[in-house]
UniProtKB/Swiss-Prot annotation:
Biological role: Involved in the maturation of specific proteins in the endoplasmic reticulum. May be required for maturation and transport of active lipoprotein lipase (LPL) through the secretory pathway.
Gene: Lmf2
Keyword Glycoprotein: yes
InterPro entries documented for this protein: LMF (IPR009613)
Principal localisation: endoplasmic reticulum
GO BP annotations listed: protein maturation
Residues that span the membrane, as ranges: 10-30, 75-95, 102-122, 123-143, 164-184, 226-246, 259-279, 316-336, 363-383, 396-416, 628-648
Subcellular location per the Swiss-Prot or TrEMBL entry: Endoplasmic reticulum membrane
Organism annotation: Rattus norvegicus (Rat)
UniProt keyword Transmembrane, yes or no: yes
Protein name: Lipase maturation factor 2
Biased composition (Basic and acidic residues): 665-681
Length: 702
């Protein structure tokens, strides 16, 4: 079993980077989303119910309960929380010493606290995925940094007994995420996925496309269909290879997953989600694949025994068999054939929903047993490593660590089986009842979650889009354009990764149904009629670009349009659109319709917020930081943070002297392997040069 210390460090750095983006992105939107004048004020979610302090904290686990003790309201507490999270994540990304379980515990607790008051704007699957991944990072992070003088070795020699157990959970999480995301596309009975036409709609109907999506949308239809087949292959057939005993199969699975995520990043603005998925794929790598040391990257050509040669041959045969089965299954189940006359690849789904359901019933429980067997193997390896530990004190402390982390690993695996089994109801019902009880007891902590992205393809008849309009007289209407979501047909789609404009995302969901399905939209209308600047900055960060910057609109309404990508021949236009219907009626402040909706959705404040002391130094500091950062467009702020991290790491690499240990060791090995000469020649070659200040080099033979 190859060592995985380098992938573990990559994982920890990747989690820190995603936390950095998530906290910084959320920080820029707090006043407009959760402030006292925001769309959904956070203070409404934290109202004491007369319960004890610890019971209240357990039922709604958020540090923001303590904000009043600091003289802060809930929104200011959220400001402080996200700023501290950003700083801690930045530190963990740059400093090895801060990649400690305690730091990752603070990051996880801070993001969980934010999600408790985030309401609908923090109900995305990637928020749950970050919480689950972040908790695993607490277990993966080492309590003590390994000595720099010890070179990690492969096999059992260079690893601590417990260190690979939590990292195995990362691989299991990646499997659950990808397998479920592939399966739900077919269990949903979505005609676009079953007809292999989903990608002919996806690029223009996704929430926030990138400019590259326009070009991808105009690729040939047969290539779109083939891409859907490849998606099913990568998401359903490849994930079991994550647990393959053959190393090259795991590496092939890694590159397949990485390719899919990179293509999604290029064509869609999915914030930090795909970056986080790429971080999870590090669990498929090992030191030998990533190390710069030649002796770790490749095997030396040395004579091998016949049993080892036989084992290598059998592994190669098994590997080729797996590739052959994947190719045959893809061709058979999706009817792949080449039309040489048209020079295209034809594809179609050759199985029925009933057949797929039967197959899913047949394989879901075996995948659970596959995970169980893989975990059992990891536990046996950990136990064997513990047996090899020398010294009773080291063995004692290693045993404690192994017991704690082994128990935590088994516990997290057990509770994860419950949400994983949602993909197949029959398997869910056959799970051990103890697993259900354990999961129910900690479900609110989001330690294990169910996943299933892009279950159904929306916008098959055109992309629905809500367009807000304002007026001063009720006759002449002006469109209110958002920074990111489609509006102006001549404006190209933006590239925002890793920022997530949460209001723009919810506007996309709102367009899929009536406005009553999105109660927050009524609050948005109210805040715009009131002219609240924090909400205006969610729409246009530069208030000068907002059409009603001088005076709030007297009337507001919303229209629903259908948008399509423009044709390649259209000049200076990225979209064309068609009006569909009125989405939200024309209202003004005090309008009975607006008042009724606010009352119906519980969006009217029963009492004004209590004013906090203006002399609070912490609150004044938070307000000052907000004033300095608010003029920056959020995606530029995040790119600036990323650029700063890259610059610091490059400078640090250039200024750090390269260690001589590895080069000296290599020379020593070569010297030992050199053919023996007479003693005089050997002494002449190895004698140190007295003028070299302690360093030496072999003399050249004349």
């Amino acid at each position: 079993m190859a060592s995985a210390r380098v992938p573990q460090q990559l994982f920890l750095q990747g989690v820190a980077a995603v936390y950095l983006f998530a906290f910084a992105s959320l920080y820029t939107q707090i006043p407009g989303l959760y402030g006292p004048e925001g769309i959904l004020p956070a203070r409404r979610t934290l109202r004491p119910q007369g319960k004890g302090r610890w019971q209240q904290l357990w039922e709604t686990p958020t540090i923001l309960w303590e904000a009043p003790r600091l003289g802060l309201d809930t929104a200011q507490g959220l400001d402080l929380l996200t700023l501290l999270g950003t700083v801690l994540a930045l530190g963990a990304l740059l400093l090895n010493s801060l990649r400690h379980p305690f730091i990752y515990l603070l990051l996880w607790a801070a993001y969980l606290s934010a999600c408790q008051v985030g309401q609908v704007f923090l109900y995305f699957q990637w928020d749950s995925l970050l919480l689950e991944t972040g908790f695993l990072a607490i277990l993966v992070a080492p309590l003590r940094r390994p000595s720099k003088h010890k070179i990690p070795q492969g096999g059992l020699a260079g690893a601590l007994p417990h260190e690979d157990l939590p990292f195995w959970l990362v691989r299991w999480l990646l499997f659950r995420l990808m397998f479920a995301s592939g399966v739900v596309k077919l269990t949903s009975r979505c005609p676009a996925w079953w007809g292999l036409t989903a990608l002919t709609y996806h690029y223009e109907t996704q929430c926030l496309p990138t400019p590259a999506a326009w070009f991808a949308h105009h690729l040939p239809v047969w290539l779109h269909r083939l891409s859907v087949v490849a998606t099913f292959l990568i998401e359903i057939a490849v994930p079991p290879l994550f647990f393959a005993p053959i190393r090259r199969l795991r590496l092939s699975a890694f590159y397949a997953q990485a390719l899919l995520q990179i293509l999604i990043i290029i064509t869609g603005n999915y914030n930090f989600f795909n970056l986080l998925t790429l971080v999870l794929t590090t669990a498929l790598l090992d030191d030998r694949h990533l190390s710069a040391e030649p002796e770790l990257r490749c095997h030396k050509k040395m004579p091998t025994s016949w049993p080892k040669t036989l084992l290598t041959s059998l592994s190669l045969m098994l590997e080729l068999t797996v590739y052959g089965l994947l190719a045959y299954g893809t061709i058979y189940y999706f009817g792949l054939e080449v039309d040489w006359q048209q020079q295209i690849v034809l594809s179609k789904t050759t199985f029925t929903f009933h057949q797929f359901s039967q197959w899913l019933k047949m394989v879901t429980l075996p995948t659970v047993w596959l995970g169980t067997a893989s975990l059992a193997w990891e536990l046996l390896i950990a136990l064997w490593r513990w047996i090899q530990v020398q010294g009773w004190s080291r063995k004692f402390f290693a045993g404690i660590q192994l017991s704690v982390l082994g128990t935590a690993t088994v516990f997290l695996f057990l509770i994860s089986l419950v949400p994983y089994s949602y993909v197949e109801p029959g398997t869910h019902g056959r799970l051990w009842t103890g697993a259900h009880r354990l999961f129910s007891s900690v479900e609110h902590l989001q330690l294990a979650n169910s996943y299933g992205l892009f279950r159904r393809m929306t916008g098959l008849g055109g992309r629905p889009e809500v367009v807000l309009e304002g007026s001063h007289d009720g006759h002449h209407w002006t469109e209110i354009e958002f920074m990111y979501k489609p509006g102006n047909v001549s404006r190209p789609p933006p590239f925002l990764i890793p920022h997530q404009p949460r209001l723009d995302w919810q506007m996309w969901f709102a367009a899929l149904g009536p406005h009553t399905h999105s109660p927050w939209f009524t609050s948005l209308v109210l805040r715009l009629l009131q002219g609240k600047e924090p909400v205006i900055r969610l729409i246009q960060n530069q208030v000068a670009n907002y059409p009603f910057r001088e005076q709030p609109p007297t009337y507001l309404r919303a229209q629903r349009y259908k948008y399509w990508f423009s044709k390649p021949g259209d000049q200076s236009r990225w979209w064309h659109r068609q009006w569909v219907e009125e989405f939200f009626p024309s209202v003004s402040l005090g309008d009975p319709t607006l008042e009724t909706l606010l009352q119906q959705f519980g969006l009217k404040d029963k009492s004004p917020p209590r004013a906090r002391s203006s002399k609070n130094a912490l609150a004044q500091t938070l307000n000052w930081v907000r004033a300095q950062l608010s003029p920056l467009e959020p995606s530029i702020l995040l790119w600036g943070l990323l650029g700063a991290v890259v610059a610091i790491r490059v400078v640090r690499t250039l200024l750090t002297p390269r260690p001589l240990q590895s080069s000296k060791q290599t020379r020593e090995e070569k010297r030992k392997q050199a053919p023996k000469k007479d003693s005089r020649a050997v002494s002449e070659q190895t004698a140190p040069n007295s003028n070299s200040n302690g360093s030496w080099a072999p003399r050249r033979k004349k």
